[in-house]
C-alpha cells in the first residue's frame, strides 16, 4: 500500500488518533473502526484498483455511536465510486434506507423482498415482517425515506 493510500484511508476512516494506542486498550467501537480501516487497506494492497472487489460488513455499526456509524457508512458508500462493492448487514432500517442502493429484506432466513429502498421498504412488507405497524414515508426536508413504528 502506498503512503498516499494509507493516509487517505486512515484519515477518512477516522482512526488517525488511535494509531499510537495498543489494540487491547481500544473500546469496542474503536476496534470496529480500526478493523474497517484495515479491511480497506487490505483491499488496496494489490494496487489501487478496487473494481470487482467486494467487502462484506456484518453489523458494522453495532458498537459505534451515531456519528461514527454515519462516517463509516458514508465512507462505504463513497468506495462504490471507486468500483468497490459492499454487502452490508444492518438491522437499523433507517441507516439501510439512507445508505443502501439496493436492499434484501429477510425474515427467518428467507428473502421476503429484493430491490431498491423504495420498493423493499413499504409499509405492508415491513409490517408483515416485524408483526407490527411500520410506516415508511419520504421525509420532505431530508428528501429520503424515514421508517418508524
Residue ranges of each PLM-predicted region?
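Conserved ABC ATPase signature
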Residues: 22-26, 30
Amino acid at each position: 500500500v502506498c503512503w498516499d493510500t494509507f493516509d487517505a484511508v486512515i484519515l477518512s476512516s477516522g482512526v488517525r488518533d488511535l494509531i499510537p494506542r495498543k489494540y487491547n486498550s481500544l473500546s469496542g467501537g474503536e476496534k470496529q473502526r480500526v478493523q474497517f480501516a484495515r479491511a480497506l487497506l487490505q483491499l488496496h494492497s494489490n494496487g489501487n484498483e478496487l473494481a470487482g472487489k467486494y467487502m462484506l460488513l456484518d453489523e458494522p455499526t453495532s458498537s459505534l455511536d451515531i456519528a461514527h456509524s454515519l462516517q463509516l457508512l458514508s465512507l462505504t458508500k463513497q468506495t462504490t465510486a471507486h468500483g468497490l462493492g459492499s454487502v452490508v448487514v444492518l438491522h437499523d432500517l433507517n441507516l439501510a434506507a439512507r445508505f443502501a442502493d439496493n436492499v434484501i429484506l429477510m425474515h427467518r432466513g428467507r428473502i421476503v423482498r429484493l430491490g431498491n429502498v423504495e420498493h423493499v421498504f413499504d409499509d405492508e412488507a415491513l409490517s408483515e415482517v416485524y408483526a407490527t405497524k411500520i410506516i415508511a414515508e419520504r421525509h420532505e426536508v431530508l428528501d429520503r425515506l424515514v421508517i418508524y413504528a
